[in-house]
Curated annotation (Swiss-Prot):
Superkingdom: Bacteria
Protein source organism: Acinetobacter baumannii (strain ATCC 17978 / DSM 105126 / CIP 53.77 / LMG 1025 / NCDC KC755 / 5377)
Keyword Nuclease: no
Protein's pathway: Carbohydrate metabolism; tricarboxylic acid cycle; oxaloacetate from (S)-malate (quinone route): step 1/1
UniProt similarity note: Belongs to the MQO family.
HAMAP family: MQO
Group of enzyme by EC: oxidoreductase
Pfam families named in the record: Mqo
Biological processes, Gene Ontology terms: tricarboxylic acid cycle
Keywords linked to the UniProt accession: FAD, Flavoprotein, Oxidoreductase, Tricarboxylic acid cycle
Catalytic activity entry: (S)-malate + a quinone = a quinol + oxaloacetate
Name by which UniProt lists this protein: Probable malate:quinone oxidoreductase
E.C. numbers: 1.1.5.4
Keyword Oxidoreductase on entry: yes
Amino acid sequence: MKKFLKYLLVLIILILIAGIVFLFRPIASKQVQTAKDEPVVDAVLVGGGIMSATLGTYFTELEPNWQIRMFERLDQVAQESSNGFNNAGTGHSGFMEMNYTEEKNGKMEIAKAEKVASQFEVAKQFWSYQVKQGVLAEPKTFINPVPHIAFVWGDNVKFLEKRYAAMIQSPLFKGMKFTEDPAVIKQWAPLVMTDRDPTQKVAATRMEVGSDVNYGSITKQLVNHLNQNPNFKLQTSTEVTGISQNDDKTWTVSFKNLKTGKTDHVKTRFVFIGAGGAAVKLLQLTGLPEAKQYAGFPVGGEFLITDNPAITAQHTAKVYGRAELGAPPMSVPHIDTRYIDGKKYVLFGPFATYSNKFLKNGSQLDLLASTNKSNVLPMTTVGLENLDLVKYLVSQVMMSDEDRLNELRKYYPDAKAEDWRLSQGGQRVQIIKKEPGKPATLQFGTEIFASKDGAVTALLGASPGASTSPYIMLNLLEKAFPQQTEGKWNQKLHEIVVSYKQDLSKDPVLLDKVRQYTSSTLGLNYTSPFKAANDETAAAPVAKAN
């Protein structure tokens, strides 16, 4: 027994030593020796998703002569988070997402919903411009009109009524309709009301100008257009293995072809890491002090999906419910109309899954590989402070097929198991951030990382993500290139995004003009709140000077 305890103690000590060595290992890339006369490109985009495609499009329109490289580890672009089946495609506008509004001290706070709605208006302007320029094809190939509905029952009816009363005071939500009449809700979303208990108290709001967006289609179309530019080069099946700074303050991005095993590098003045969940790991390679404050917490999602025409024909809406008390924002249930590659589907979910992977096509070692001496304590602290989230994830992972079907029946009472299949969605990596002098926090939104000189940038986090990608990348341009966005790029940015630098939540006239323009261009449903405008032909509004 003593011998066993001795060996056990030695084993524990060895494990502790190995753990300490692992945590204190160097994680930054080694500097690559490059030739003085080696060519330097203007920008490297890591990841072939919606963010890189959008930023690359901005660059080619603002600086047509820039040399740009894009690296994607899979054999095609738009196969991870941007893929149609890997995201909810909701066109987040703040219309139906009740987690964007909360009641504080008896007052309904709608600022976050206004923020998201304003950002999506920027996205629609960006896509409209690309349609006008022939960069994006027929709008229905990537966006379709789908009303956005918030639906509740029981005690949540009062919450929705208060939410509606507050939201219609904002120009961004003019035109929103509210009802407690089951017959009206059945007209809006037949599946939701079919065979529902007639004694159950229900309520819903509806925004006609809502949409469903296929971000995979947008990504592919943008990248296809970028490929027509001789100054742009896409390399697929290529994994970025290092990002290091050179003595002249440029950066070297090292990469490996996953099919041939060949390694190489490229020097660049600017790096954007738009690699979805893998952005945290790649950012650590830079060795930047600012990057040490980040860690990641991966969460996956599953959806029940049907393409049965008898069901999909009855549902043309995105219906969002309200998360259970104490549940995290990612748990908001919704039953959505989706148009993917020309076919109509209905999805319900999400059901959270757990995996150590940072990407759907990643490795189970991703979480471990991102752990180091700088973030291990913040990760532990956040885990202990968010036991409700841990409990929620455990309950979700333990769900049976019958449990998931019962959840679906809360939104589609007549649902039958044989009509639905379970589909694994994408991975999202929530940010764990430890700023100096502040406690570590778990964040549920997106965050732009920019080095002090703006040469290295990254997008971290999850929702609303793809829905507001044109706004997010515009914000990134402002952080990384402040002089250009205020100077020589300013006029072009106003041409691409007419409302650039304008607050649409405070300018109902401009908002109306913008929505008429984008809705007519993208084929969306919109009725102007101004009677006088209803008789006018929608045209692109004149950009305001900065």
